């Protein structure tokens, strides 16, 4: 999955969860300051991303993810780590 594909999915999740037009969701948009998310919204966003990308985001990491791009970077890094682990286990 490419960074652009992850960005598209994250933007879709945020748009759906927060009721914000996708055109308003830039990579640097802050969930709270720019998109109006509260703490419950943030929890729901993390849960939706965990489900969509089949990964677990620990609370400590979730607290550090405050923008769309940070979410994309975390997911991209986590997916790379999983892929590398799967490759090494299969060899």
Swiss-Prot record:
Q: Which GO terms describe its cellular component?
A: chloroplast; cytosol; membrane
Q: Which domain of life is it from?
A: Eukaryota
Primary site of residence: plastid
PROSITE patterns in UniProt: CARRIER
Task: List the subcellular locations.
Answer: Plastid, Chloroplast
A biological process (GO) of this protein is: lipid A biosynthetic process
What positions does the domain Carrier occupy? 4-79
Q: Which Pfam families match?
A: PP-binding (PF00550)
GO MF annotation: an example: acyl binding
Locate the O-(pantetheine 4'-phosphoryl)serine modifications and list their residues: 39
* Gene3D superfamilies noted in UniProt: ACP-like
As for what it does, the entry says: Carrier of the growing fatty acid chain in fatty acid biosynthesis.
Q: Which PANTHER family match?
A: ACYL CARRIER PROTEIN, CARRIER DOMAIN-CONTAINING PROTEIN
Homology family: Belongs to the acyl carrier protein (ACP) family.
Protein name, per record: Acyl carrier protein
Source organism per entry reads Cyanidioschyzon merolae (strain NIES-3377 / 10D) (Unicellular red alga)
């Amino acid at each position: 999955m490419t960074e652009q594909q992850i960005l598209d999915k994250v933007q879709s999740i945020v748009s759906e969860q927060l009721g914000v037009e996708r055109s308003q969701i830039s990579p640097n948009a802050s969930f709270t300051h720019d998109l109006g998310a509260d703490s419950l919204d943030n929890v729901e966003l993390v849960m939706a991303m965990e489900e969509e990308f089949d990964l677990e985001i620990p609370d400590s990491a979730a607290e550090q993810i405050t923008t769309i791009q940070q979410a994309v970077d975390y997911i991209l890094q986590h997916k790379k780590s999983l892929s590398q682990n799967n490759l090494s286990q299969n060899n």
